[in-house]
Structures are given as structure tokens and as C-alpha cells.
Amino acid sequence: MTQMTPPEIVSELDKHIVGQARAKKAVAIALRNRWRRARIDEPLRSEITPKNILMIGPTGVGKTEIARRLARLANAPFIKVEATKFTEVGYVGRDVDTIIRDLVEIAIKDGRERAMRVVRDRALDAAEDRVLDVLLPPARPVGFSEPAQPQDSATRQKFRKKLREGELDDKEVEIEVASAPMQAEIFAPPGMEELTQQIQGMFQNLGNSRKKLRKLPIREALKLLADEEAARLINDEEVKTEALRAVEQNGIVFLDEVDKIAARADAHGADVSRQGVQRDLLPLVEGTTISTKYGMIKTDHILFIASGAFHLSKPSDLIPELQGRFPIRVELESLSVEDFERILTSTDACLTRQYEALLATDGVTLSFTPEGIRRLAEIAYQVNEKTENIGARRLYTVMEKLLEEVSFEAGKVGVDKLTVDAAYVDARLEVLAQREDLARYVL
């Protein structure tokens, strides 16, 4: 779990997301509260439950990006799911319990990777020993009663040094490695994903004990053997126990597109039980016990962050019980021209920098003037206002259209430099931006 303070978390998010200070502050406080709660003694600690967050705002303003960046900062089990993928129990589709099962799988995978990193050096030493045993086999005994003669340690150390310096990387050796687990694709009715996983696990375990001889370059052999040795050194039971504890105490679930399961009060017609999905989410968000193949998981202290554009519905269209489970509400603002400018220039991997790097591979020096960037931001904002407002995603469309010609011609003789100023932007985009009918289809 991260030990960053709320200002530090917001500062990290600022490197990738423009504006939306209130949303960043809310998720930073929620993340820090997980750390604070862990330092409180029982029985008070078990009484402190996370305050779930509902983020409301138009598409393309940073809701999903906040979730993506938060996942990297959290250092805790994290899963992002779309609410539209789930249906009420009894309908065709996935039921909401699979969210927690998937979260457990993610936590165990992350835990195993961390454990393998801890024993990596020991595993590499063991892998080197196995390769050296192949390169320098023990001398054959003269009689049956005499033991095998070990190789001179000085020779072994000399070969180990060559091995570590990469001098033997391309030499091929024949080694005995565990055979790859049997891959069996099993199709089962919706709602039976756990049974499917158990059957697949059974088939995979059938082939785990088998070993086979393979001829490989030493570079690849070392990697395979190191992975095999690391898997032997870690304690799977400890990994699973720690993963289950981390999910229960520090797990974070990001529910995207939650507005799509909010049925409008004035809506009528076919509906695959949107309210049913909401009712199924209720116990999950409030706190219940979910059965997984690794054990029972309590969801009482899992943090839920929901987000939605709420274009066609309102937060009040959610059933009242679910509304009450998200006490913290944050509204994200639409992007202004200034925001578009900052997205193009001030984030760590801004679009202008990405295109400069892409075209540099073909020997084209691309540069943007401040006036050109301002004009780009104005056009993106205008098109959003005149047609559908898709937020920052409009910049992808505008930039692709702007640089279409140079991207196509890059690599040809004479195409080695381009400066994007206001005049160039107008020449390429102004006609399209002014004609609403064209902008609707092209931009």
C-alpha cells in the first residue's frame, strides 16, 4: 500500500491529467485513508469503512485516466471494470461476484511476481549451477564403488565468470525443464466462470510434473531455469494468504460507465434488468462475503469508485440504496481552451512530444510554436462545442488529421523538417472546423 500523502498523490496525477482538482483530491484522500486505517488498533479499525466515491462528468475529461494512474500509485489490489458488462443473476452475462474473483486473481498474480523478485538472485545462482552442471559434467568414475569426481572449482568459477559476462550466451545446451502446462479452452454457461477456472486448473496440473529435454541457447536456458527455480523458492500458500488479506483490507474497485445501468424514470421498453444489476451491486458495495476458489472474501473494507458521464440519465436515477453507498460525489468540469493547451504541452507524455518522437524515427524534425498549439486547442474546443463533446479525445482526431500528410510522406527525400504554426493549422483544419457537416464526420 502506498505511503504517499494526499498532496504527493495529487502531484503525481497532475503529471498526466489536466485540471479536475476536486476529483484528484477526493481519490487522494480516499487512498490515504486506507493507510491511516491500517495504523489504528482493533476493534476500532474494523469499524472504519471506506467512503465510496461517485465521479460525475462528461466523457473525455479524465475519469478513466484517474483510475488508470491511481492503479499504478496505489500499490494495492486494483481492478477496473465496466458496469455494462454485468447482468442480474439469471440473465445471460457475467454476475457482479466475478469482480471480486478477478480482483483476487490480480492480487495473487502481483503477489507471486513480488515474491519472485525477492528470490531472483538466489534463483539465478541456482540456474547458473544447473547450466554449469551441463557444461562441466562430473568425471565418470573408474569403478562402480567410486563416487563421481567433481570438477575443479577454479574451472567452474572461470566458466561462471564467462556465463555472467555473456560470453556463452549463444552456445547451445541440452537441459531438462518442466513442460508447459496443458492449455485447455473450456466453454461454460454464463455465471459458471469459477467452475471453468477450476477445471482448467485441473488440466494444467496434469502436465506440471512432466519434464522434457530441450536444446536452447544459454541465454534462454538461464531465463527458463531461473523462473523454474524462483517458483520453487516461493511459498505459494503464503502468497495466497497475503493476497487475500490485501484484497480484503486494501482492495480498490473502479466501476466505470455506471450511468449506463441507471434506467431513466421516463424510459420505457426492453431492458435487461438494469435495476437488477444495481440490486446485485448493493451487497457487494455495502459489505458481503464472496466465495472464491482461494477462500472467502469479505468486501466490507474494499473501496469502490464509480464513474459515469450521466448524459442520458442522472445520479438520482440510480436506486436510492445504491446512491447512499456512494457518499462522496465529485463533479468533473468540461475542458476549456486553456485545458486543451496544457494537455498538448504540460503533461509528461503529451501528444506533441509523442508525435515528435514518432516522426523522428523517420528523420523528420517536428516542432510546434505556441501560436500553433493555441490554434489547435481552439479548433478542438470549437468542434466539441458544435458537435458531440468528447473531451480530450478530440485532440487525437485533430492531431491525426493535422499530421496526416507529413506522416504519409515521412522518409522521402526532402521531407525532414516541419514547424506547426497557426498558419499551418488553419491551412489543414480551418475549413473542416468551420463546416459543421464535415467536422461531424472528419473531426
From Swiss-Prot:
Disulfide bonds: none annotated. The keyword ATP-binding applies. One of its GO terms (molecular function) is ATP binding. SUPFAM superfamilies: P-loop containing nucleoside triphosphate hydrolases. ATPase subunit of a proteasome-like degradation complex; this subunit has chaperone activity. The binding of ATP and its subsequent hydrolysis by HslU are essential for unfolding of protein substrates subsequently hydrolyzed by HslV. HslU recognizes the N-terminal part of its protein substrates and unfolds these before they are guided to HslV for hydrolysis. A double ring-shaped homohexamer of HslV is capped on each side by a ring-shaped HslU homohexamer. The assembly of the HslU/HslV complex is dependent on binding of ATP. This is ATP-dependent protease ATPase subunit HslU.
